[in-house]
């Protein structure tokens, strides 16, 4: 079995996670290939020996890899999708961060859950992604023009609101007068969109959510639409530029440039352990059903 390992940061709390992970992988004779920057961090902190193979980009991840393990929080998991892209390689998230909606494997369960993975006792949750196309070239994004959580437009260098003309399949929907607008996938519905009052979607829902950020037109509410909808946005404001973000990647775009957002032709395969389903994660992470009065 051949797997890739990816992470972004190292903290004191990460050390036991790395130790348990690599002990299990080595004991089971699994071929491990580590992302080179993460490997350098681990070697510097004496967490691993400098004997592992390394990879540097998505081009190195071919069909010989059975999965990629992301070590970190949800942000690290989202970054891992830029390495996997359309390869179909499943991602398993080990949580070394905080909430962990995507990185669902906790430290105390590393060996148990990885054993289930080795025994193929898991399911694949296929996650929708969004693609972005801009009328003018966005240098900061280049070929990473997709997002697993959300694509967001927001104001830049101003406290003034922006106006976002929104079209669905060519038909005018609304002009949002707000701090910004979130286009969220079902995966992203538990993130930024939820914080702005958007609904939670199950991962299997074939829908997207349009959620305004602090809208001044108070009757503008989050809207759930089919995920085969093509969305066009035209942003105007007092400043020359506004911001567009794809998960954690951000770029500056000129006013009046047309953004086209739609579902990508590929999905991300996320490994889901039976003990850590989406509904269980809702109960455990958002404390659904818990009554603190008792």
From Swiss-Prot:
Question: Localized where?
Answer: Cytoplasm
Superkingdom, natural source: Bacteria
Query: SUPFAM superfamilies, alphabetically?
Result: NAD kinase/diacylglycerol kinase-like
| Keywords tagged on the record | ATP-binding, Cytoplasm, Kinase, NAD, NADP, Nucleotide-binding, Transferase
Where in the chain are disulfide-linked cysteines found?
none
Which GO terms of the cellular component aspect does the record hold? Answer: cytoplasm
Catalysis: reaction(s):
NAD(+) + ATP = ADP + NADP(+) + H(+)
Q: Which EC number(s) are documented for this chain?
A: 2.7.1.23
Q: Which top EC class is named for this enzyme in its record?
A: transferase
Entry's Gene Ontology molecular function annotations: ATP binding; metal ion binding; NAD binding; NAD+ kinase activity
> What's any GO biological process attached to this entry?
NADP biosynthetic process
Give residues annotated as binding NAD(+). 74-75, 79, 149-150, 179, 190-195, 214
> Which residues are annotated as active site?
74 (proton acceptor)
The protein here is known as NAD kinase
Look up and give the organism this protein is from. Flavobacterium psychrophilum (strain ATCC 49511 / DSM 21280 / CIP 103535 / JIP02/86)
The uppermost taxa in this organism's lineage are: Bacteria, Pseudomonadati, Bacteroidota, Flavobacteriia, Flavobacteriales
